[in-house]
Amino acid sequence: MARALAKKKNSEVAVMDEDMFAADAGIGVNDLGTDDLAIPFIKVLQKMSDELDDLDGAKAGDIYNTVTKEVAKGKDGVIVINCAYTLQHIEWEPRGTGTGAPHRIYGPGDELPQTERGDDNKDYVVDGNGRYLERTAQHYVLVVDKDGITQQALLPMKSTQFKKSKQWNSAMRAIKMKDRNGNLFTPPRFSHLWKLETVSEENKNGSWHGWQISKDSVVLD
């Protein structure tokens, strides 16, 4: 027999009992697979970002989570743990056409199609009807909130930000720690917290907001 939900009278103040949910922790969500979930991306909002039309108070230079819809001010930044990295070449349809999804994704070791550099510095696929390849550094991170709770996210870095990715990888590899015997070793990439902020950038082609990455502290647990 179905259990009826208890209702409070209008004069009573409803108080949530977390233990009621804790007893059934994970039911209905733990069995979800990757095909059932959206991938959260962390991105810097730009002047022409569509999200600015829908997010109250958001502005160019803010940091946006595409799944939670959370916005962090660029000057405040977010804290992340960098867990993994891969380099991909993503083949895109011409702007304004297609579904907005990649035409094809090439991983490390995949044979890339022949390309020609266009006047806009994009690498266009030869006989690809305007499709172009974009070299993209994919950083798989855990975003850490002020309470220490983490959430998985993907942080792509391409175009003007690709250099930032290389610098970040170099900074992680340069970290040295000492073991109990005083011997130096290189810790894993997920050993430290990093702060991601945003800064204004420009070149002869225009201006935008990009990442500013700094080491925060070592992961304690």
Tell me what each language-model feature is:
Residues 1-150, 203-210, 216-220:
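OB-fold ssDNA-binding interfaces and closely related basic DNA-contact patches used
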Residues 43-46, 50, 170-174, 180:
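Polar/charged alpha-helical tracts
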Residues 120-130, 172-183:
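Short secondary-structure capping micro-motifs at structural edges
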Residues 134-136, 150-152, 163-170, 186-189, ...:
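Short, well-structured alpha-helical interface segments that form or flank functional binding sites
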Residues 140-178:
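Short acidic, glycine/tyrosine-flanked loop/strand segments centered on an H-E-D-like triad
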Residues 173-221:
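Long, compositionally biased interface segments
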